[in-house]
């Protein structure tokens, strides 16, 4: 079995150990070159504060991107409730800290083979004062070919956009050229749909802009009511026709 297949199997097995098939589906994994020019372009698209892989791990050769898709039950709930979703909040609260377990298993596997590796924390990689994040898991996943961005700023994979992304950097050479993915977002494709704009409870998301501060304020409000302590909303994902793909 190739190193890439071993890493993919390791990630799948670790997530399966959660034993929560009611919340999570089988992860999907892909790889990108740490020196892909699109990482440098993120300094223009996102901002100069966004770090390149080699600024996080100097000898990085590859970025491992993976997505843990939520189940249909989890994805469907946020659009049906006021405030935060119980199922979405639980899935979020469980998987975010568990990414540390998955990442450490991957790092240990690579270390045993003589490669350096490090992970970027799954969430809250931004300064709450300015909402500037030093790393975008979704953008890394897009570069790795896992999906394309929709109008709601979420990455739509072959399993949809409802779920969570994470990244591991390594000195191992794992990447291969990925064919450009075709967008699944109906609004991006032909201007139809737009349900994500209509459902946003605070109008943070509109066709030509997204206000991160207003969105985060709504998530913080929901956090006060969430028994899992999750600062989430998920409505713009839940309402999307391609949020869940079987």
Q: Where do the protein language model's features map onto the residues?
A:
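Catalytic cores of enzyme domains
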Residues: 47, 84-246
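Non-catalytic, usually N-terminal nucleic-acid engagement modules in DNA/RNA processing proteins
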Residues: 1-91
């Amino acid at each position: 079995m190739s190193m890439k297949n071993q890493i993919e199997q390791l990630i799948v097995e670790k997530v399966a150990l959660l034993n929560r098939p009611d919340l999570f589906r089988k992860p999907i994994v892909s790889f990108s070159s740490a020196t892909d020019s699109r990482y440098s372009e993120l300094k223009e698209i996102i901002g100069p504060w966004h770090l390149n892989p080699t600024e996080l791990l100097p000898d990085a050769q590859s970025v491992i991107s993976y997505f843990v898709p939520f189940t249909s039950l989890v994805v469907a709930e946020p659009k049906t409730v006021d405030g935060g979703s119980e199922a979405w909040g639980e899935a979020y609260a469980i998987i975010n800290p568990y990414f540390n377990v998955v990442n450490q298993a991957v790092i240990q596997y690579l270390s045993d083979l003589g490669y350096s590796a490090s992970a970027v924390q799954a969430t809250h990689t931004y300064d709450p004062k300015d909402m500037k994040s030093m790393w975008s898991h979704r953008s890394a996943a897009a570069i790795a070919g896992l999906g394309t961005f929709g109008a709601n700023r979420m990455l739509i994979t072959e399993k949809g956009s409802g779920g969570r992304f994470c990244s591991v950097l390594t000195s191992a050479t794992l990447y291969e050229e990925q064919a450009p993915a075709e967008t699944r977002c109906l609004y991006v494709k032909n201007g139809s749909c737009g349900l994500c704009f209509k459902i946003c409870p605070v109008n943070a998301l509109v066709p030509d802009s997204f206000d991160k501060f207003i969105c985060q304020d709504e998530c913080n409000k929901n956090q006060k009511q969430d028994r899992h302590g999750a600062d989430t909303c998920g409505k713009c994902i839940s309402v999307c026709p391609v949020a869940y793909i079987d």
